[in-house]
Amino acid sequence: MSSGKVKAGELWNKSKDDLTKQLAELKTELGQLRIQKVASSGSKLNRIHDIRKSIARVLTVINAKQRAQLRLFYKNKKYAPLDLRAKQTRAIRRRLSPDEKSRVLEKTKKRTVHFPQRKFAIKA
C-alpha cells in the first residue's frame, strides 16, 4: 500500500481481515523505509511520518470496532467491564443507589405509622 495517506473514512467500511492485512503491509513498508533511512540519506523522513500516522489510523479503527462489538455483547448483561461503563466521577460512584436511598429502618416506619404528621386548622 504505497499510495499516499490512509483516509480514516475509507477504513470504517473495511472488514477486520482487510484492516489486519493493511496493517501488516504498512508495518512492512515502515520497516523498509527505516532500513533505507539508515542505509542512505534521509530523503524519505516525511514518508515515515505518514506511514506511522496511517498505522495509528488503522489501529484506531480496529480498536473502535472491537469495542463496539464488546458493547453489543455486554448490552443486557448485569455486569460490564469497567472500561465499557459510562464514565462517572468518584463521588457519583460512591453515592447511594436508589434502592439504598429508599430503605427505612423498622423503628422509623413504626414511628411514622403511629405518629403521623399533625394537621392543624387555622381559625380565621
Curated annotation (Swiss-Prot):
InterPro entries: Ribosomal_uL29, Ribosomal_uL29_euk, Ribosomal_uL29_sf. One of its GO terms (cellular component) is cytosolic large ribosomal subunit. Pfam families: Ribosomal_L29. It comes from the Eukaryota. One of its GO terms (molecular function) is mRNA binding. One of its GO terms (biological process) is maturation of LSU-rRNA from tricistronic rRNA transcript (SSU-rRNA, 5.8S rRNA, LSU-rRNA). Keywords: Ribonucleoprotein, Ribosomal protein. The keyword Isomerase does not apply. Belongs to the universal ribosomal protein uL29 family. This is Large ribosomal subunit protein uL29. It comes from Triticum aestivum (Wheat).
